[in-house]
Amino acid sequence: MAEKKQWHETLHDQFGQYFAVDNVLYHEKTDHQDLIIFENAAFGRVMALDGVVQTTERDEFIYHEMMTHVPLLAHGHAKHVLIIGGGDGAMLREVTRHKNVESITMVEIDAGVVSFCRQYLPNHNAGSYDDLRFKLVIDDGVNFVNQTSQTFDVIISDCTDPIGPGESLFTSAFYEGCKRCLNPGGIFVAQNGVCFLQQEEAIDSHRKLSHYFSDVGFYQAAIPTYYGGIMTFAWATDNDALRHLSTEIIQARFLASGLKCRYYNPAVHTAAFALPQYLQDALAPQPS
């Protein structure tokens, strides 16, 4: 039997993960990124950008449920949602499940990501691109949040790691723009990497976000193909009560929403804000 080709992730220099490649479905360099989608027997279809896994069919639900339902149910009455990135459509899929949301704007820098994901990762968007509340904007995320006249109740930054095109979505200019177009009491969330291996990202995001929001923190989830421990999600708002809502309040909102999830539930919601001590220590104010 011929040995299967292997694809090795290049996120870290000293160690990493690999996938057996059963079939390459798509591989092309766009103006912005090197995109590949291949099939793997364990994780289904896998998409990688610039040598780093972005999503797999097997475990994407964890990431997208936590990035979406935590801020939307904590907010309680979000009407207008902005997604930065998210070209695979799975974040949009989860937002559309909230029937009280009236408009969903998605800003994606690369139209190529959207078009090939619609073709090669159809389970991710699950038809959500056809939702009448949805509007796609092809633009740089930093430019959009600093120029738009729209305002939003929840902003979800589905960014890549802070290298290459994704680097701008970890800058003060981006965070300031998000604060600018966020309604009072609104919530901003963003993926912030695996904190055991990318702790400096969390520290840097916390420091920058604290210039613009009065309540800044993180919540977490364990996602198998984002290896190295828990993944952290940045959380920023000017309403500090939203991070400390009781499980009972979240439970009531969850039941009213009619959501059926595979990972998220109200107990997971409240527990997700409990962070390991090493991260708490890293984020604590340093003595002068």
UniProtKB/Swiss-Prot annotation:
S-methyl-5'-thioadenosine binds at residues 33, 108, 140-141, 165. It catalyses: S-adenosyl 3-(methylsulfanyl)propylamine + putrescine = S-methyl-5'-thioadenosine + spermidine + H(+). One of its GO terms (cellular component) is cytosol. Its EC number is 2.5.1.16. GO terms for biological process: spermidine biosynthetic process. It is found in: Cytoplasm. Pfam families: Spermine_synt_N (PF17284), Spermine_synth (PF01564). Residues 9-238 form the PABS domain. Pathway: Amine and polyamine biosynthesis; spermidine biosynthesis; spermidine from putrescine: step 1/1. The active site is at 158 (proton acceptor). Spermidine binds at residues 64, 88, 158-161. It comes from the Bacteria. Homodimer or homotetramer. Belongs to the spermidine/spermine synthase family. Catalyzes the irreversible transfer of a propylamine group from the amino donor S-adenosylmethioninamine (decarboxy-AdoMet) to putrescine (1,4-diaminobutane) to yield spermidine. This is Polyamine aminopropyltransferase. It comes from Shigella dysenteriae serotype 1 (strain Sd197). The gene is speE.
